[in-house]
Amino acid sequence: MSKHYYIGLMSGTSMDGVDAVLVDFSDDKITLVDTHTEPLPSHLLSGLQRLCQSGSDEINRMGILDRSVGKLFAQAVEGLLTKSGVDRHQIMAIGSHGQTVRHMPNLELGFTLQIGDPNTIAALTGIDVIADFRRKDIALGGQGAPLVPAFHQQLFARTGHQRMILNIGGISNITYLPGDASAVIGFDNGPGNTLIDTWIKQVQGEAYDKDGAWAASGKTDEQLLKQMLSHSYFSLSAPKSTGRELFNQAWLEQQTSDFGYLHESDIQSTLLDLTCHSIANDCLKLTEKAELYVCGGGAFNTELLTRLAALLPGYQVHTTASLGVDPQWVEGIAFAWLAMRHKLGLPGNLPAVTGASRETVLGGLFPGN
């Protein structure tokens, strides 16, 4: 039987590189064939970080970065094809998430903006590109996020098993798979790695806290933790989504301004607990017991997993590796899956999750020829 090859491209709020995955959807199965990560050059990273905050000359900077990120995504495709040995003519489509630079769905005319020009990707690779996945959902009154719960349902749902799929990137999102006829629930629950990455970068110049070791060396300040958990976002009911617009360096500086006496590692520990407590609180609102499977960069933070397990004694805490899927690649596979759904004319959103008025085919087609 012929292979149904699709490529998924993802760069999340952590901005730590472009994940490229090659997936085969033949025989009604989801098979991860090969993977590649294209590093984000430091000049591009600093430009994107600047663009994520309001500033002067934004339109020019966005236009240039849109093309630059498109070229980087095309390089990721070329790297993946070279590594896999699969001919580009066998690829049915590329699903490109792009790089989010604004996500503001709750304005009167809500919007979300991902850059990484799909025309550039299509022109440089010669492969059809499906992109701009979020804005149709927003046009239908939804949040445009999270989009992965529909994929989590397809891949991980099992009758009789209550499962939580927890994706911890810069922002963390939860998918609750009840294991019966009840509707799937999913939402962004708050900061994942974004604040702990921001703080260690500011203090130590490191990109991330490996294994959560620095946080583990500190002591959480309960007063600061309580103050941060009082943020109105945490008490919002779903559907809800968030991003760097809320949880960023400016917010972190504002929150810690009265806590200058704390050791830097104590702040790191408190920020990690903010991630863990906000996740645990949301999980317990949904169910007292479940199987919890973690994916995304947070799945590799052993201190995070340890603290999460302690806060959720009724939960079995694992990574998606226990289900046979490497936690690093779950989101990339999801965007290959969304491209496949688009090609087949099938919906990609879950209105119960995003708040959209109906199911819809997501994304636009940018032909490679």
Swiss-Prot record:
Pathway note: Amino-sugar metabolism; 1,6-anhydro-N-acetylmuramate degradation; Cell wall biogenesis; peptidoglycan recycling
SUPFAM superfamilies: Actin-like ATPase domain
A Pfam family annotated for this UniProt entry: AnmK
List of residues binding ATP: G12, T13, S14, M15, D16, G17, V18, D19
Any Gene Ontology biological process: peptidoglycan turnover
Highest taxon of the lineage: Bacteria
Enzyme class: transferase
Classification via InterPro entries: Anhydro_N_Ac-Mur_kinase, ATPase_NBD
NCBIfam families per UniProt: PRK09585.1-3, PRK09585.3-2
Function: Catalyzes the specific phosphorylation of 1,6-anhydro-N-acetylmuramic acid (anhMurNAc) with the simultaneous cleavage of the 1,6-anhydro ring, generating MurNAc-6-P. Is required for the utilization of anhMurNAc either imported from the medium or derived from its own cell wall murein, and thus plays a role in cell wall recycling.
The protein, known as: Anhydro-N-acetylmuramic acid kinase
Organism field: Shewanella loihica (strain ATCC BAA-1088 / PV-4)
Species classification: Bacteria, Pseudomonadati, Pseudomonadota, Gammaproteobacteria, Alteromonadales
Gene name as annotated: anmK
